Amino acid sequence: MDHFIKLLPKLTPHLRKGDCGKMGVIGGSLEYTGAPYFAASSASRLGADLIHIFCDPDAAQVIKGYSPDLIVHPGMTANSIIPKLSRMDAIVIGPGLGRNPNIWPLMQELFEFVRNRDVPFVIDGDGLWFVSEHIEKFPRQMSATVLTPNIVEFSRLCKSALGEEDVLNVRNNSQLQHLAAELSRKMNVTIYLKGEVDLVVTPNGEVSKCSTESSLRRCGGQGDVTAGSLGLFLYWAKKNLGDDWTSAHHEAGIASSWLVRTAGRRAFEKHGRSMNTPLLLDEIPKLVRDVETREMKDTVHTDSSKH
């Protein structure tokens, strides 16, 4: 919770629209319309001011129907997306992206944009599949970037980058941590490995862990919530820490992990095996409010103790 409190921006009368975050989510295809919504909605409920979704035209009308809060842009070409990203404080690619081969050229131009702008960048879902398929073309100067694999996506990355063939059968957390550190060094990028214990590993070998109790349900969409919230936390961390990306990745990673795990646990306690990702999202506003209320009480107690 401490990481969460540290990054949560104060709301004051002096803030303007956009000050708490403008985020772009790139994803959404004919088959997968829920994933980009989950990523965007998590950031919205956490406190982002503006969220743009860039998606396949086949998905646009469906996603627009989910929420009037989201700004939806049909079109999955570099020419239609890259110029709009200059206004974004953080970018997430992958939720519901699909595997159309035409997406890879977009990703290559996006990599160049992120490197030049040094903007917080999260790669999740099918974005990781493309990275695994084109590992030799993944740039090595992506200091602002975090990859967020689950174990299946992690195994693909390890096979492509490290030549490791049997990662899916690794159950020992120490072994997984060793592999994540090796992958982070090899790719020169931060790895946020989701699992029984979430690991955030930076290329310098530093490791942060979050084992906060979570939901026993493994329903689809929880990783999308992680990607969206992480993107926003990375922006807030950058505002606090400047260009110290190592610290920003650890702070934001653990804050996101704690948020998703705690919201999932609360939803599971209420709904049991019927719990799903929309129910997890419903827990985020109350969770944020609880954290803010506790912080206010702690501040009042601390101030009172000084007199």
Swiss-Prot record:
CDD domains: YXKO-related (cd01171)
Pfam families the UniProt entry points to: Carb_kinase (PF01256)
Cofactor: Mg(2+)
InterPro entries per record: Carbohydrate_kinase_pred_CS, CARKD, Ribokinase-like
SUPFAM superfamilies according to UniProt: Ribokinase-like
Record-annotated YjeF C-terminal domain positions: 1-291
Single biological process term from Gene Ontology: metabolite repair
Family recorded in the similarity comment: Belongs to the NnrD/CARKD family.
Name listed for the protein in its UniProt record: ATP-dependent (S)-NAD(P)H-hydrate dehydratase
Record field: catalytic activity: (6S)-NADHX + ATP = ADP + phosphate + NADH + H(+); (6S)-NADPHX + ATP = ADP + phosphate + NADPH + H(+)
Role played: Catalyzes the dehydration of the S-form of NAD(P)HX at the expense of ATP, which is converted to ADP. Together with NAD(P)HX epimerase, which catalyzes the epimerization of the S- and R-forms, the enzyme allows the repair of both epimers of NAD(P)HX, a damaged form of NAD(P)H that is a result of enzymatic or heat-dependent hydration.
Lineage: Eukaryota, Metazoa, Ecdysozoa, Nematoda, Chromadorea
Keyword Repeat: no
PANTHER family in UniProt: ATP-DEPENDENT (S)-NAD(P)H-HYDRATE DEHYDRATASE, ATP-DEPENDENT (S)-NAD(P)H-HYDRATE DEHYDRATASE FAMILY MEMBER
GO MF annotation, one: ATP-dependent NAD(P)H-hydrate dehydratase activity
Residues bound to (6S)-NADPHX: 96, 150-156, 224
